[in-house]
Swiss-Prot record:
Tree of life domain: Bacteria
Activity vs pH: Optimum pH is 6.0 for hydrolysis of alpha-cyclodextrin.
Subunit note: Exists as a monomer or a homodimer in solution. Homodimer is more active and stable than the monomer.
Transmembrane segments: none
Stated name of the protein: Cyclomaltodextrinase
Site (Transition state stabilizer): D424
Family: Belongs to the glycosyl hydrolase 13 family.
Catalytic activity: cyclomaltodextrin + H2O = linear maltodextrin
Residues at the active site: D328, E357
Keywords associated with the record: Carbohydrate metabolism, Glycosidase, Hydrolase
Entry-linked SMART domains: Aamy (SM00642)
Record-linked CDD domains: AmyAc_CMD, E_set_CDase_PDE_N
Length: 588
């Protein structure tokens, strides 16, 4: 066995409390190197005749990526504390892996050899809102969704959909427009909407906030927002707003005071200013988002800034009953601020959803004291490469997803925000080269995978567009210009996700990933409920074997309702190019 590939640490994604009674312990080994792993464990204070008392239990392999196998044990220590190690076997070889290294037999004279989970404290649990696991999100860019009140449209706003957008163009989308189309969202099956910023700002995107306590007048007023939230809640739809706390806009009052009064401004320490007077060329002499001078970075460690922003966060929850905050550029704000942010909003509404925008490994923010989830860009990247661009093989795709899933605790994955497109990325149909079949596969994967899926407005009807601003076109409301077949496909998948708990909350296992014909088979299992997803990501028809012994089972085609008994040991499924099928597996 390759010792250098065997790895565990007693924290984060390798050792964590899944709930108030259960510990999840993971082990990493070289791919295809180890035959069998057992967890060796016991209470650190259980001794008899000078020997530590321990027991063993088998660990199960939960997946593999390109380099490693991952093993899991779920244990409920009766006294909520544990010392533990691992017994690995390959062929005739046996190793006992402990915190102090490798042994041929398990030491019993001192528990200090072993890994330690000192105590399972309920207060330390990572606890995301349970409702998020069942939510299907819909992201709305308010300026481009619908114009429900032309009287408040910006001066010079273009007729709806009359031309392609520019970085500075306006079309008059507003909150009333969203209210007017809630029935559309409810019909699709949406149970959560995520609004990009709605606070007063000069731009069309509103990420340059001028006043965090006011709705932008071109979007509506506070009464309109209250109506929107109330109507959404009546339809079982949650509402999440976008918080831009990393930076403000150029017109933000305190920054304007600094521009006016320079070093004498009482707000000068609200920002990261290197010297006075402020300059923007060749680059700003104050910290900004990227190098954008119109977006000065806020000093969130400053007590007044912290108090101001925490007041913002709690105000919109307390007064408008919103259900979540999406946090822009969350990784560039200090961890202490986010800890206090969580305490403040959770004290007000314990099941509020805290979602961070982080594009890289986000484990430091997902330990239970800051965020409930992050936007799952690694999943989106892998899905777009495999299904749309076709520059990733089936096995590479499965490996990538297993790596993502094993990078975080299970409950983190269950609450992950699984997007495929957004206001920052090209439209799905555009990335797919206009091939609707590929878009269907993307939605199939997204709506059957672990996590909380989010659809970007218009992707469900086949809207097109490249990078910003092309991906921010006006929503198409003319039925003749909507792809109704794609809409019905998405609607059916959402309905199946609601019907089958395994699709929402089940464990995922990749059963086959064939690189020759690029087919993929994975299963979602929750208790006795199993759904198999079989995909042909190829431009040729394929006969795909089901990689399970299905004898004695009923197979129900979830797309057609066809139900048949599996009598043969192996079954093959015939799929057209870019075809797919979902089977519920039921016992006779």
């Amino acid at each position: 066995m390759r010792k250098e590939a065997i790895h565990h640490r007693s924290t984060d994604n390798f050792a964590y409390a899944y709930d108030s009674e259960t510990l999840h312990l993971r082990l990493q080994t070289k791919k295809n190197d180890v035959d069998h792993v057992e967890l060796l464990f016991g209470d650190p204070y259980e001794w008899h005749d000078g020997a530590w008392q321990f027991q063993t239990m088998p660990m199960r392999k939960t997946g593999s990526d390109g380099l490693f196998d991952y093993w899991l044990a779920e244990v409920k220590p009766p006294y909520r504390r544990l010392r533990y190690g691992f017994v690995l076997r390959a062929g005739g070889e046996k190793l006992v892996y402990t915190e102090k290294g490798f042994y041929h037999e398990a030491p019993s004279d001192d528990t200090a050899y072993y890994f330690c989970f000192p105590f399972l404290h309920r207060v330390d649990l990572f606890q995301a809102p349970d409702w998020v696991k069942d939510t299907v999100w819909y992201q709305i860019f308010p300026e481009r969704f619908a114009n429900g009140n032309p009287a408040i449209s910006p001066k010079g706003a273009r007729p709806w959909g009359s031309e392609d957008p520019t970085p500075t163009s306006f079309f008059g989308g507003d909150l009333q427009g969203i209210i007017d189309h809630l029935d559309y969202l409810a019909d699709l099956g949406i149970t959560g909407i995520y609004l990009t910023p709605i606070f007063r700002a000069p731009s069309n995107h509103k990420y340059d906030t001028a006043d965090y306590f006011e709705i932008d007048p071109h979007f509506g007023d506070k009464e309109t927002l209250k109506t929107l939230v109330k109507r959404c809640h009546e339809k079982g739809i949650r509402v999440m707003l976008d918080a831009v706390f990393n930076h403000c806009g150029y017109e933000f009052g305190p920054f304007q005071d600094v521009l006016k009064n320079g070093a004498a401004s009482r707000y000068k320490d609200w920002f990261h200013i290197r010297e006075f007077p402020l300059q923007t060329e060749p680059r700003p002499n104050y910290d900004t988002f990227a190098f954008v001078p119109q977006m000065p970075k806020l000093n969130t460690a400053h007590p007044e800034v912290k108090r101001y922003l925490l007041d913002v966060a709690t105000y919109w929850i307390r007064e408008f009953d919103i259900d979540g905050w999406r946090l822009d550029v969350a990784n560039e704000i200090d961890h202490q601020f986010w800890r206090e942010f969580r305490q403040a909003v959770k004290a007000l509404k314990p099941d509020v959803y805290i979602l961070g925008e982080i594009w890289h490994d986000a484990m430091p923010w997902l330990r239970g004291d800051q965020f409930d989830a992050v936007m799952n860009y690694p999943l989106a990247d892998a899905a777009l490469r495999f299904f749309a661009k076709e520059d990733m093989s089936a096995s590479e795709f499965a490996d990538r997803l297993m790596h993502v899933l094993h990078s975080y605790p299970k409950q983190v994955n269950e609450a992950a925000f699984n997007l495929l497109g957004s206001h920052d990325t090209p439209r799905l149909l555009t990335v797919c080269g206009g091939d609707v079949r590929k878009v269907k596969l993307l939605f199939l994967f997204q709506l059957t995978f672990t996590g909380s899926p989010c659809i970007y407005y218009g992707d469900e009807i086949g809207m097109t567009g490249g990078n910003d601003p092309e991906c921010r076109k006006c929503m198409v409301w003319d039925p003749e210009k909507q792809n109704k077949e794609l809409y019905e496909h998405v609607k059916q998948l959402i309905a199946l996700r609601k019907q089958y708990r395994a699709l929402r909350r089940g464990d995922v296992a990749f059963l086959a990933a064939d690189d020759e014909v690029n087919h993929l088979v994975y299963a979602k299992t929750d208790g006795n409920e199993t759904v198999m997803i079989i995909i042909n990501r190829s431009n040729e028809a394929a006969e795909i074997p089901m990689p399970i012994d299905a004898r004695g089972k009923w197979l129900v085609n979830l797309l057609t309702g066809e139900r048949f008994a599996a009598e043969a040991e192996t079954l093959c499924v015939s799929l057209p190019p870019y075809g797919f099928v979902l089977y519920a597996v039921e016992s006779w």
